[in-house]
């Protein structure tokens, strides 16, 4: 499995966004409010779902997203959004 684009843990999934996004993109996300972040669910969330294989092919990451979120029925799309929102929250705290 290509670990670069297919992280197996939730921490790897969030950390990978900090590694692959350029400084300008990080600043754009950091400058968004929680309400504005919702506009990125359909775009960035979809890319995360595809590249992290959350729609199928990466059951370990999906399982961990369910466990950490406390939502056992989380699907691939919801898991991608959860990863995106956690990434955004870390940006807000300056923990990138």
Each language-model region and where it sits:
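Compact alpha-helical subdomains of small soluble proteins
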Residues: 23-96
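N-terminal secretory signal peptides
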Residues: 1-31
């Amino acid at each position: 499995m290509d670990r670069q684009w297919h992280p197996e843990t939730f921490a790897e999934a969030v950390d990978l966004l900090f590694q692959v996004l350029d400084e300008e993109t990080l600043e754009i996300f950091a400058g968004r409010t929680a309400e504005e972040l919702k506009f990125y669910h359909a775009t960035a969330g979809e890319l995360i779902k595809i590249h992290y294989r959350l729609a199928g092919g990466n059951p370990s990451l999906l399982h961990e997203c369910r466990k950490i979120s406390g939502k056992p029925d989380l699907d691939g799309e919801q898991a991608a959004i959860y990863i995106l929102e956690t990434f955004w929250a870390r940006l807000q705290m300056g923990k990138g």
